[in-house]
Amino acid sequence: MARYRCCRSQSQSRCRRRRRRRCRRRRRRCVRRRRVCCRRYTVLRCRRRR
């Protein structure tokens, strides 16, 4: 839960945009675990940007 904190903070808007883009690009993996995939990539992107 702590890992997803970044997306729930003020970076949520940025995360949401990246999350949709990333998910659509990796559609094959996202289709099955759409939420997990999106959330995982979102967290990674957010953490690296910070």
From Swiss-Prot:
It is found in: Nucleus; Chromosome. GO terms for molecular function: DNA binding. Disulfide bonds join 7-15, 38-46. Its main location: nucleus. Testis. Keywords: Chromosome, Developmental protein, Differentiation, Disulfide bond, DNA condensation, DNA-binding, Nucleosome core, Nucleus, Spermatogenesis. GO terms for cellular component: nucleosome; nucleus. GO terms for biological process: chromosome condensation; sperm DNA condensation. Protamines substitute for histones in the chromatin of sperm during the haploid phase of spermatogenesis. They compact sperm DNA into a highly condensed, stable and inactive complex. Belongs to the protamine P1 family. Cross-linked by interchain disulfide bonds around the DNA-helix. This is Sperm protamine P1. It comes from Equus asinus. The gene is PRM1.
